[in-house]
Amino acid sequence: MPYFDNISTIAYEGPASKNPLAFKFYNPEEKVGDKTMEEHLRFSVAYWHTFTGDGSDPFGAGNMIRPWNKYSGMDLAKARVEAAFEFFEKLNIPFFCFHDVDIAPEGETLKETYKNLDIIVDMIEEYMKTSKTKLLWNTANLFTHPRFVHGAATSCNADVFAYAAAKVKKGLEIAKRLGAENYVFWGGREGYETLLNTDMKLELDNLARFLHMAVDYAKEIGFDGQFLIEPKPKEPTKHQYDFDVATALAFLQTYGLKDYFKFNIEANHATLAGHTFEHELRVARIHGMLGSVDANQGDMLLGWDTDEFPTDLYSTTLAMYEILKNGGLGRGGLNFDAKVRRGSFEPEDLFYAHIAGMDSFAVGLKVAHRLIEDRVFDEFIEERYKSYTEGIGREIVEGTADFHKLEAHALQLGEIQNQSGRQERLKTLLNQYLLEVCAAR
């Protein structure tokens, strides 16, 4: 049965369009540089927020109007698959993502859970045969069920570690079967509340053991997708071990895992870590670790993960700047890990939200491409650091200087003159490029 029968396929109509159910800036076939927008952006729908989210919060019950919610159990799971692929087709989106519990309910036993997953994966596989929409990534939910109260791979209970491993094993088998481009690890419960009852060294060692086992099993079954770590500093756990890119990178390097992983970076997680979105992208990029993106935004006035759809054009521009500088996302994409607000409870709001996010990143892509083509920031940065291309600066970079040589150089200096960083000028240029792209017809 159709679930969005009042919605037609979303088409590109251009900036002058007044149709709320049309793209104003995202034209999948438009070339930006040597790729189309669709190839650059690789958009993805998050199954959990879009098809399982009900709008509930700590202060109120679920209120989302979803036609498929008239069903329950496995019938509900099947209806969600039907609704999902109708949504994908009407939005003309190339990818989707899910956790295992998003697509099928957990059973009374692990075997029953596997059976439920197999039934729904069979159904998804059939739909994918005739759909352009592919699986960007999947993952195992290792944080919702009470068994994970003390963590999964970092749990103090070895039985929980084993159960988590079984779920990831199944997840990797599903990833291979459905042709997932990536597989994600997010450690929402991998951390601690107090050191008074925590063996941090054992927990970190066990987390590394767990990830090495995952790498080994992927090789065993021939899954060649990219493994991704998704950093987040807090929520639900006070001290999460994958606080930010730098922290997680240090962990991967320490335990010999760096060659097997890249990062899935979420904008709102960067906010919670006290960073900008572009900061996290830059840190990952310069270390060759930028793999994929969870595209959303947070509310700067609130201290939790609000998962709003991305509409901040400065943020999308600076994000796309980093992604283009990275040469793209490879097998990754821009997954809308975002939910409509609780007050936006009608089915068509799902389309309005995704259109807003897709248009926002399309603008960001075009502005970022122009900034890079015109070398707006590159030229300024090169001039700013010019002292390292000649004289004593060049010797520092080439490793031929030492403290003796640097002291001798410093002793002959007079008063050192610095130059302005010109932040305001550069922000004005960013505004100019952004406004020019938005004004173009």
Curated annotation (Swiss-Prot):
Domain of life: Bacteria
Enzyme class label: isomerase
SUPFAM superfamilies assigned: Xylose isomerase-like
Main location: cytoplasm
Residues of the active site: H99, D102
Catalysed reaction, written as an equation: alpha-D-xylose = alpha-D-xylulofuranose
Coiled coil: none
EC number: 5.3.1.5
Cofactor binding, note field: Binds 2 manganese ions per subunit.
GO cellular component terms listed in the entry, alphabetical order: cytoplasm
Binding-site list for Mn(2+) 2: E266, D305, D307
Binding positions for Mn(2+) 1 per the UniProt entry: E230, E266, D294, D337
The protein's required cofactors: Mn(2+)
Gene Ontology biological-process entries: D-xylose metabolic process
Keywords annotated in UniProt: Carbohydrate metabolism, Cytoplasm, Isomerase, Manganese, Metal-binding, Xylose metabolism
GO MF annotation, one: xylose isomerase activity
Cellular compartment(s): Cytoplasm
Homology family: Belongs to the xylose isomerase family.
Subunit text: Homotetramer.
NCBIfam families (alphabetical): PRK05474.1, xylose_isom_A
Family annotation (PANTHER family): PTHR48408, XYLOSE ISOMERASE
Name used for this protein in its record: Xylose isomerase
Organism in which the protein naturally occurs: Geobacillus stearothermophilus
